[in-house]
Amino acid sequence: MHETEVKGILSAQNGINIYRGCTHGCIYCDSRSKCYQMHHDFEDIEVKLNASRVLEDALRRKRKKCMIGTGAMSDSYIHLEEKLGNTRKCIELIYSYGFGLAIQTKSARILRDLDLLKKINDKTKCVVQMTLTTYDEALCKIIEPNVSTRSEEHTSELQSPPLS
C-alpha cells in the first residue's frame, strides 16, 4: 500500500475509483492492462488520501444530479477498506449531495454499508452489482483467489432484502 494525493477523482462519465489497484488477484482482470498507465504493481494499492475531499468538491460543482459509479477498475471493498473506511466516506457524500450510486463489488464487505445504500435508494437510486463467476469454490480460489467465497456472497444476498 502507498498513499497519494489526487487532483481529481470523478471522471467525465461520473465514475470514481476510490483506490487504485486491487488485491483480489483475478486472473482475467482487464484493469491490470498497461493502457491504464499504472506505474506500480497492481496489488500495491494506491490509497487516495484526499479522495473524499476531492469528491465533495466535484459533487458540489455538478449542475445535474446523476448516478455515480464505482468499482469498475478497483473494487471499493478491498481488504484495506475495513481499516480505512474511504468507500463509506465517499458514499456518505454521494448520499448527502443527493446523487444516485451504482456500485460493483466481489466482496461481502458491502454489507457494512447496507444502511447507507438503502438511504440512497430511498432518496434517489442505488444499484449494487455483485459478480458471480462460478459456484465451484475450488475453481473460484484459482481464478479469483482473494474474493469473498460464493457461500459468503450467497449469505450476503440472503441477509439483505432488495433495495427497492
Which residues fall in each region the model found?
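Conserved Radical SAM active-site core
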Residues: 1-129, 135-138
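Short acidic, glycine/proline-rich loop/turn micro-motifs
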Residues: 139-143
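Single conserved hydrophobic/aromatic residue that forms the stacking wall/gate
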Residues: 152-164
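Glycine-rich S-adenosyl-L-methionine
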Residues: 146-152
